[in-house]
Amino acid sequence: INTGINDTSYYWNELSRCVNLYCDLKKICPELDSLNIGGGLPIKTALSFDYDYEYMIEEIVSQIKTICTRENVKEPHIFTEFGSYTVGEASAVLYSVLQQKRQNDRELWNMIDSSFMTTLPDTWAMNQQFIILAVNNWDREYERVFLGGLTCDSHDYYNSEANLNAVFLPKITCDTPCEEGQEGDVQYIGLFNTGAYQEAVGGYGGVQHCLTPAPKHIIITKDEDGELVTKLFAKEQSYKSMLKILGY
């Protein structure tokens, strides 16, 4: 059901049609015993996200059982494909702000040290929204900004207008690129719940758009005492690695 699982009349009507079709097929083929309702269970893409998972799952199961009982058909084994829900919260992407530039009287751009098109391709392809938070400098005043990537492509930016969600981040105090330890040092930002599709679509280990290097990959787990443990999975891609792939 291509709308995703939402508490709307359209979704419930489509689910009802799906289950009724299963019942019709079950009467023709008694060996049929399973129903795949697909994916579409949403994940948190904004801090304001509010979704009653327990209610929705219980209601889906209840409606399937009700229709099958009415049609005198044994209820099926239910299969789902909740990919985004399963893996979405497993990843985050961290960027640093290289520099800030004023485009005009209204647009203040924070330029990140990577590319949205290569690391989070859904932001470019379908204006996907993700949770954006400042990693440091929470004690500073904040300002509305736009986020741009490093590539030469005019589409390499986070489209906050399409998401109707302005981006507010701590004020940048450096006129030139900041360095660690400098007054108003490097501003880091994180985009969270990025575990679904992004790396699979963007690719891993190859050559990216505009030769943007693949970022460093770090795995964060907890030990038996509940303490966070980090492990380097892959270093940031080097120019030598990219040139070797290209045959130089």
Task: Outline where the language-model segments fall.
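Active-site loop/helix belt of alpha/beta enzymes
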Residues: I1-R106
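Charged (often Lys/Glu-rich) extended helix/loop segments that serve as interaction or gating elements
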Residues: E59, K65, T69, V73-Y248
